[in-house]
Amino acid sequence: MATTKYEVTYIIKPDVDEESKKALVENYDKVIADNGGTMVESKDWGKRRFAYEIDKYREGTYHIMTFTADNADAVNEFGRLSKIDNMILRSMTVKLDK
């Protein structure tokens, strides 16, 4: 089976403190690794203003992860967890070209 490269961008609420944000990022990096993904890069893009309001917030902290995986388990688990996590406003997963 071919290894696929993915990029996940997610937005963290702006009122989350640094310690909680760091724990959240480490947790999601671990979710990817625990589900068969290999982390290539995980970086903070910082706080940015939105073009429109999301859940009564006008800005959020962007974080981007790039990883490889042999199957979609890591992507599916991240998607499931990010939907129920109240610290994440939005997330987007993109399959990158080989």
Swiss-Prot record:
Gene3D superfamilies: 3.30.70.60. It comes from the Bacteria. The keyword Ribonucleoprotein applies. One of its GO terms (molecular function) is small ribosomal subunit rRNA binding. CDD domains: bS6. Pfam families: Ribosomal_S6 (PF01250). Keywords: Ribonucleoprotein, Ribosomal protein, RNA-binding, rRNA-binding. One of its GO terms (cellular component) is ribonucleoprotein complex. InterPro entries: Ribosomal_bS6, Ribosomal_bS6_sf, Ribosomal_S6_plastid/chlpt, Transl_elong_EF1B/ribsomal_bS6. Signal peptide: none annotated. One of its GO terms (biological process) is translation. Binds together with bS18 to 16S ribosomal RNA. HAMAP family: Ribosomal_bS6. Belongs to the bacterial ribosomal protein bS6 family. This is Small ribosomal subunit protein bS6. It comes from Lactobacillus helveticus (strain DPC 4571). The lineage of its organism: Bacteria, Bacillati, Bacillota, Bacilli, Lactobacillales.
